[in-house]
């Protein structure tokens, strides 16, 4: 089972934070019902675990934490760090088990790593459990942005798009509507197969942030996927190029759009030429330039560029290029 892999530094910081937390809790022994002697033993093993970790001695740190577990088997924090350490030494099933125990002992605080393990498992059954966990956590922590974001991701992992949008609504109440909110909603609608709503979400955000280049790029992507009218796509490409006149993909795609819709071929050639000057071995750019030359009757020059495009093309790029190649080279 795949679990988030922690670096040594991350584990150390977690231990240090936990150790400081325990040291600072004067009522800790009373809270857990431990005697002073047992509390001292517990702290001794926590410090020993930290020292072992300082020297990258994971096995020794693990042994010390297991003593802590024996002294207080109901301590969720100990269970969570045992999960982290078992993961560090590649004992994934034990790691998952301890993270699960930590969550069950303290669901309001020990849900994050357990949720990450469930999410990364890639297993449908575990993803269903993740959604149940996420729903429980937001009831326990209704003002926690991370908890609502976890529910959003859990819902998406289960293809529950309605729940994902509800979680995003709650996130927006907590932190306001912004670019991240718009992007999250856009992705949900795309995943749900609702391109019109995805486009509407992008346009909603652009209404308040009209200079955001990335969202204009999102807009034209969804327009092309929807086979939107030529003039609509053209207007979006023009806006993109106003914001970034040297955006190569936009130059190439706008040039090709003009070519296949009977637009201004001189303008298309000029834009396409700029892309191959910047990236002379880019198969996609070469293909576009060759096709525009062909449409203008310049097949001799077009042949040179389409041959170069085919030589440089990756396997997944070849289908469209081969079609153009056969037409330009007049092959059957």
Where are these regions (language model features)?
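Structural signature of tandem alpha-helical TPR/SEL1-like repeats
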Residues: 55-63, 89-98, 122-135, 158-167, ...
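Conserved structural position within tetratricopeptide repeats
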Residues: 67-70, 101-104, 135-139, 169-173, ...
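N-terminal leader/linker segments that initiate helical-solenoid repeat arrays
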Residues: 16, 22-81, 88, 329-332
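Start-of-helix register in tetratricopeptide repeats
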Residues: 43, 77, 111-112, 146, ...
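Residue-level recognition of tetratricopeptide repeat
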Residues: 50, 84, 118-119, 153, ...
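Canonical tetratricopeptide repeat
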Residues: 81, 115-116, 150, 184, ...
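Alpha-helical adaptor scaffolds
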Residues: 115-118, 220-225, 248-277
